[in-house]
A protein has these predicted regions:
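Classical Sec-dependent N-terminal signal peptides that target proteins to the secretory pathway
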Residues: 1-18
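Ankyrin-repeat boundary/"N-cap" motif
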Residues: 19-32, 54-69, 88-107, 112-128, ...
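Ankyrin repeat structural motif
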Residues: 35-47, 74-84, 104-111, 133-145, ...
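Ankyrin-repeat C-terminal turn/loop position
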Residues: 50-51, 86-88, 149
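Alpha-helix capping and inter-helical loop/turn segments
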Residues: 73-74, 87-88, 165
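Leucine-rich solenoid repeat scaffolds
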Residues: 142-179
Length: 182
């Protein structure tokens, strides 16, 4: 009977620990929690409670993680903290970045229709506004690659950029990464 009680205690302790660790997602998604406070709390959960920075909740069928949540909620300090805690950037984040390009194109031109760039979009990609946006996103991509993201996952973004005839910079960035990490 004593052994059964110990086993039950251990199982409930493990479940309780994982449930506590999932609170890190709540801190990121909570609009009332500042980025600074979210970063401090998450650091506590990782360093003091031993939570796994690469935790993926069972309800996240797509495999999204804390890094994806921090990025989508514009919590930059939390995002940087997670990278410094050796989180593994996943493929979901590359899809988010690729989608941001599509949304940006749509907000500033007619966008892409039927796998073709509109004439307005082809003119837009020559503007300073687009070049600034692309530079910001490419800095992020480089940062993610430097933290272990698989360059293969940028295939979707490459397809989007190829449609507008602007895939060469991404190709160079990915090739340079592959060369530097052989």
């Amino acid at each position: 009977m004593k052994q059964l009680a110990i086993i039950i205690f251990l199982i409930t302790s493990l479940y309780s620990h994982e449930a506590n660790c999932l609170n890190m997602f709540a801190m990121i998604f909570d609009k009332n929690t500042t980025d600074e406070n979210a970063a401090k709390c998450i650091e506590y959960y990782i360093d003091e409670l031993g939570c796994d920075v690469n935790i993926v909740p069972s309800f996240a069928n797509d495999g999204s993680n804390l890094l994806d949540a921090a990025y989508e909620n514009n919590k930059t300090k939390t995002f940087d903290l997670l990278l410094n805690k050796d989180i593994t950037p996943g493929k979901w984040l590359t899809a988010i970045i690729a989608t941001e390009f599509l949304v940006f194109f749509r907000e500033n031109s007619d966008g892409i229709k039927d796998k073709k760039a509109s004439p307005e979009l082809l003119e837009f990609i020559k503007t300073h506004k687009y070049k600034e946006f692309k530079e910001e996103k490419f800095k992020l991509i480089k940062k993610l690659l430097d933290h272990g993201q698989n360059p293969y996952h940028y295939g979707y973004l490459r397809v989007i950029l190829k449609i507008v005839g602007d895939e060469k910079d991404l190709d160079r960035l990915l090739e340079q990464y592959k060369k530097d990490n052989k």
